[in-house]
Amino acid sequence: MGDVTRGEWVVWGLEAGPGETASLHHPGLEDMLLFFPETLAILSDTGEPQGELTIEVQRGKYKDDIGILTHCLLVHASSRGFLDKSLCGSSLLGYLNNNLELMEQHSQEFIKFPVLPMERKMSVLKQDGQFVVTRSVKEGEETKTGVSVFPYKTFKGFVSSAANVVLLRVMAWQQSVPSGARFLALDSEGKLCHCTYKSLGFQTIQVGNQQAKMFIVEQTIHSEEGIPFSCQYYLLPDGHLAKRVQVGSPGCCIITKMPLIREEDVIESPPTFDKKPLVWGEDLELYSKFLDRKEQLRLSHASYLRHHPEAQALVSDFLLFLLLRRPEDVVTFAAEHFRPFAALRSPIPALRSSHQPSPFRTLENEEEEEAKEEEEKEEEEEEEEEIAGEIEGEEEEEEIEEGDDYLYMDEDEDIEDYTYYENYYYNYDEEVDSYDDVNNYDDDDIANVDDNDDIDNYDDDNDDDDDDDDNDDEDDVDDNDDDDVDKVRAKVDNLSVDNDDNDVVNSDNVDVDNDNNNQG
């Protein structure tokens, strides 16, 4: 409730400085074991019992004026006794939040004198952001009532009678009282004033055969109109009230039986256990999991090979390349070999651990290395393409044989040319047989025959050409396919001319035969 913290108040939430009004705040009330009942005996100045005092602090719930239930601290105290053989008593009921701020409080005091009984009541309620104090005094048949309203801000640091009970128990646990601290309080007339707390040291009390050390705290309510009201509290270390003395009164309240002193629970640190080496092979559970996982992976591998028969071929190809190239770094070679088969190809190497980047290497060096790797890969692909092209060229080359002549040609040439060449050679052989006899021709006819019609000359030329072709190197044929095609076409043109000449010779032969028949 305050902003200033001084000295030991910080320990348990009381805040004040010398001459200042303190405020209350304590977040760990439940940790101090403050919830317990206690009973004290009221004794006269002669030591005779006159009654008893009961105090209890417990957890409770409070319903505000709009019907909302909240958790709170419930303080209840009551006393019954005799004063000059007249019955007297008091009661207190208060609701506090965890910051010891008052939510509602009701108090009552009475003395039943034979002639003029007296009764005094006072209630403090929090309504609409302000505190309403209602006080009534009844003497005989006459009753006086007064109502006072205080803004909520003016009650900052207010210590009610209920809060005083809890605050004393907190002081007992801490064995300390703030020096020079002031709090707000209400006097017996219901007017706002201030109160102070002061430590009176320690004292030993003996109850029966037991002794205990008590911490003494004095509270003084400084009324502006009346004399100060002081009360001394003798507190046991666990917060129990062992004795209460009102200054100026002959009587007192004291315990008759020593309570069981409770000590604050000491939280022990959790035990530390040395880490033992884990031998999974000797652990039945872990070894069982290992066998199950091993069998699962084996079945998964077998299932994958059944559904992907091409995997065996890929492995075989890899082993073949491995034996042929014999790389120094087998792991990197395997990564580069199987990289094209990856489902998601990334620009980084498949095995990043083989190329761990140095923390001191710049990104430019890394990019240069990646570019260099890509260039080497492209060169390897080009070499493989060239080798594959040479193999395909050898397979596509065809050899055509006609007698002693060999004609090399590619598949790109027109198939109609092949048919034409074969038909031509076939017809030519038949015609040569019919013209071998030179006597069948007249001299004029022979003279009219062109030099190109001489079959012997043609055959010699062809033989020479074929011999030249046979002597050419196979590499020249492969490299000069266009030249060979031109030569073949030239031969075809010559043969076409010779064919036309042969047609003329055939017609002449027909005429000669007819003349011979007529002469016969």
UniProtKB/Swiss-Prot annotation:
It comes from Mus musculus (Mouse). Pfam families: CATIP_N (PF21772). It is found in: Nucleus; Cytoplasm; Cell membrane; Cytoplasm, Cytoskeleton. Its main location: nucleus. Residues 365-409, 428-485 have a biased composition (Acidic residues). Plays a role in primary ciliogenesis by modulating actin polymerization. The gene is Catip. One of its GO terms (biological process) is actin filament polymerization. Residues 504-520 have a biased composition (Low complexity). This is Ciliogenesis-associated TTC17-interacting protein. Interacts with TTC17. The keyword Cell membrane applies. InterPro entries: CATIP_N. Keywords: Cell membrane, Cilium biogenesis/degradation, Cytoplasm, Cytoskeleton, Membrane, Nucleus. The keyword DNA-binding does not apply. Belongs to the CATIP family. GO terms for cellular component: actin cytoskeleton; cytoplasm; nucleus; plasma membrane.
